[in-house]
Amino acid sequence: MNLKEQVDLLTNKPGCYLFLNKDNEVIYVGKAKNLKKRVSTYFNKAYNIKTTRLIREITHLKYFIVDNEKESLLLEKNLIKKYRPKYNVLLNDDKTYPYIIITNQKDPMYKYVRKYEKKALRNYGPLPIGSNARSILLTLQRLFPLRMCKGDLKKPCLYYHLNQCSGACFKTVDSSYYEYQIKQVDKFFKGEINQVKQTLVKQMQKASDNLQFEQAKRIKDQITSLDFITAKQNVDIVTNKNIDVVNYEINEEKICFVMLFYRLGQLTYKDEYIQNYEGQDLDELLNSYLQQIYQKNLYPDVLLIPNEIDLLDLDENLLEFSSYSFNNQDDIFIKLAKQNAVDSLNKSILSNNVNSGDELEILDQLQQISNINKYPKRIEIFDISNIYNQFITGACIVYINAKPVRNEFRKYNIDSQYTSDYARMKFMLEKRFLKRIKEKEQLPDLIIVDGGIIQIHAAKEVLNKLNLKINVIGLSKDNNHKTRYLIDIFEQTIDIKNFKKLYNFLTSLQIRVDEYAKSGFRKKYHNQLNDQILLIKGVGKKTNLKLYKHFKTIDNIKNASFDELNKIINNKKITNLIISNFKK
C-alpha cells in the first residue's frame, strides 16, 4: 500500500500519528483532533524544495486512535520521549528553570529547585538569570523564617537560635504564623520590598559597626540580589499579572522559538530553542514547544502568542490562558519576543556558518558560481549604514579561508556630503585601498559589496583608478530582506538559495557586516545626543539618560513642549535651561 492510500484510509477521530522513513525509523510524531484532516495537510500543501525534506523522507505511517484530546497529548509526549524523532521539538531534558518554592506541609519550608513543582504551596519564578537565587533564598530564610530543620527534634535547633527557623523543631507552630510569613513573601516577590531593604541595611550597618565585615559583606550581597530581581525594565509595564510571551523566526533552514517570562511586570527569564525546519506544521511545532516548557514551569495568567498562529489549534490546557495582542503593551511584548528570536537565529548562523572541513568546498563553490579566476582565500566584505542619512558609517570585515579575522575589521566615517550609495561606497573603498597600497598591506582576492549593481560599479571604478585587479561581486536580498542573490563578475544575478552551505556562509557574512556597520552609526548617534545635552550647563548625566530613554532622538527632545520635558525631568529650572538653549 502506497503512502497516499495509507492517508486516504485514515480515520476522522482524534489520535497520534507517526511518520517513518525507509529504515523504519520514526522521524516525526504529531497529534490531531482529526487524524485524516491533519495528516492530509502535509501532502496537499505546495512546499518549496527546501521544506520538502520531511515529506520526501516519509515512506509510511502509523497511527493511534484515542478517546479525547487529553489522551492524545499524553500519548504524543510518551511517543516523542520514546523515539526522539529528528523533526520534533526536543527540548533538552537537562534544561532547568530556577524556582524558589514553599513546600505544602504542616510546617512548610523553603527550597531552591530547578523546575516548577505542582505539589508545592508556592512557586516563585522562574528567577532572573544571574540573580543569585541561593542568596535570595538565604534572605528569605533570615527575614521570614519557616521551618529550617527536620522538625520535632524535642529541642531548639541551631537555626532557631539564629532566628532562621519557626521553632517546629521543639514546639507546635500555629498555622497563622505561616500564613503571615507567606503573605510577606508574596509581597516580596511582587516587588514590595522597601521595608525588607531597610531591615537589611540596618543589619549591615550593625555588623559593620561591630567589625563583623564578612557578615556585612554577605548582607550587602543579599541587597544586591534584591536589586537585581526587582530591577525596573527599559519598557514601562503596568500589570500585576504573570505574562508569558512566545514568538518565533524562520529562515531557510531553521526555526527559533523564544519565550519571555514576565513576573509582576518584570522580565525575569528568557528561553530560546533552535532546530532545523523542514516544513513541519508550525502550529504543531509551537504546541510541542509550549507543552515542554510548561512541563517545567508554572502556567501564567496570560500567554501571548503571535496573531498568525491559530488559537484553536492550541491544546485545551493552553487555550484557557492564551491570547492575541490586544493593546500597545501586548504589542511591545510580542515585538520584543520576535526581535529576540531574530537575534538568536542570526547569532546561530554566525556561530555555525562554516563547519570544520567545509571551508574548501564552500570557497570552491563560491569561485565557480561567481565566475572568478582566483581562489578567494582572502575576502573583504563592505557595507554602509546610516540613520536618516546622518551618522553614515562604512564597514569592512575580513575573512581568510572562510573564517572571520576580527582584528582586521574596520569602520569608516563617511561625510554627509556624499549623498548617494555610489559616492559613499566609492569614498570608502578609495580610502581603504589607498592606505593599504601605501603601507604595502595584503589585498583581497575577492571583494563582496552588500548591495547591487550600483555598489559593484562604484567598486570597479575605484579599482580601475588605482590599477588594481581584484574580483568584485555583490550580495542582494529578497523582498523579505533576507539574503537571496549573488551578482557575479559578469553582473549576472544568481539565486543562491539552493546552495545550502554557500547560502549559509554568505548569509552570515551579510548579517555580520550589517551589524558591524550599524554598531558604528549607533555609537556616533548616541555620542552626538549625549554631547548636545551635556553641553548645557546644569544638566547632568542622569537627566541626560532620562531624556534619551524617553525621547530616543535629539530632534524629539528639541521639539518637546515644556510640559513634556518637565514630566520626565521634574525640575522646572533645568527644563527652562534646556528649552532656552535649543532656542538659541
Curated annotation (Swiss-Prot):
Cite the Pfam families for this sequence.
GIY-YIG, UVR, UvrC_RNaseH, UvrC_RNaseH_dom
Query: Where primarily located?
Result: cytoplasm
Q: Which GO terms describe its cellular component?
A: cytoplasm; excinuclease repair complex
Q: Where in the cell is it found?
A: Cytoplasm
Q: Which NCBIfam families match?
A: uvrC (TIGR00194)
Q: In UniProt terms, what function does this protein have?
A: The UvrABC repair system catalyzes the recognition and processing of DNA lesions. UvrC both incises the 5' and 3' sides of the lesion. The N-terminal half is responsible for the 3' incision and the C-terminal half is responsible for the 5' incision.
Q: What is the protein's name according to its record? A: UvrABC system protein C
Species this protein is from: Mycoplasma capricolum subsp. capricolum (strain California kid / ATCC 27343 / NCTC 10154)
Organism placement in taxonomy: Bacteria, Bacillati, Mycoplasmatota, Mollicutes, Mycoplasmataceae
Gene that encodes it = uvrC
